[in-house]
Amino acid sequence: MTTLHVYKSLPQWALYRKMLQLIPTCFLLALVLGCAGSQGIPKELSAAGPILVWPLPPEDPRIQYVSSVASPEDLGISKGFFRKVFEFFFGKTEERIQQPYGVTADSDGRIYIADSALRVVHVFDMPEQKYWSIRGTNREEFQFPLGVTLDRERRLYVSDAERQAVIGFDRGGNAFATITEGLQRPAGLAFNATNNLLYVVDVIRHEVLVYDLKGKLMFTFGGRGAEQARLNFPTNIAIDREGRVYISDAMNFRVQIFQSDGTFISNFGRLGDAVGDLARPKGIGIDSDGHIYLVEGLYDVVNIFDRDGQLLLTFGSAGVGRGEFWLATGIFVDAKDRIYVADSYNSRVQIFQYLHNGR
């Protein structure tokens, strides 16, 4: 496993003392919404402007800003002739991201973004240079989409917190399954390639529910509490290449790690205002070297930890510019170690690259 340099000097940590100006009134909404070019970066995602990396020189760079996505035009996707004709007669469709939460991507560069404000999943298809959106099933539209994940066949699964369901879609955007058994408030979800099961975090049940791909509930783990292996309003989930499960345990202010069968391994984190403390943990992701990426919603940064909970690096800051966040939520790290961060109140997804050995 490649070792990241520990970030010894973290400038601008005065932001750790700031408070969010917008405080959501709904408790559940607060939990989920916060109420040098390197090899492997596609040409279409290469950054414009000065190179932005973390940590700053003279340290070797480990994270590089790549791009920002707010609309199809940001990725060079232009409207086709028939789309223009359709909009001429029927009006323009909403294609600009408004309030992203969950994000995922496949190895070919298709990006899927759950937009809870527009109640859609945006699909940016880079290989085909196309954009479309999924609004739900033929029988019922999304009410509050949050989590997105893909299985090994690249079928899409979307959690809808209001519908108390997870809906499966084929690659053409057609619904093929609706999972409801046991669900009360599904949020984050992830597919485990080691056992071909779908893991769903339920905020209200304080549990992780595990299903086969036919929608059968196989087992659950967690349950409300502060003891190890217990959860308190969990929100997000990630699964590494070995099948280990990582949970953002929001109101216990920690990350918990489990085996694929729900057996507890370890946890780390605490509430506080020191560097690396977890005041409002949100999205979580894992890179190919096993580093844990955790969105810190209160301070508008992404913290990177090793599996023992040692803080290795922090990137981002509060703001609206490149590499800055305003109430970031979800995060996803793909097989090429591209990092996608749902920058919720900036209405965009920012893309970064993990640089192995500083390049």
Put a short name on every predicted segment.
Residues 1-18:
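N-terminal secretory signal peptides that target proteins for export/translocation
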Residues 1-2, 24, 193:
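Intrinsically disordered/low-complexity terminal segments and short unstructured peptides
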Residues 21-22, 258:
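General helical structural elements
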Residues 23-32:
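Bacterial N-terminal signal peptides
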Residues 35-359:
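Eukaryotic scaffold repeat domains enriched in small/polar residues
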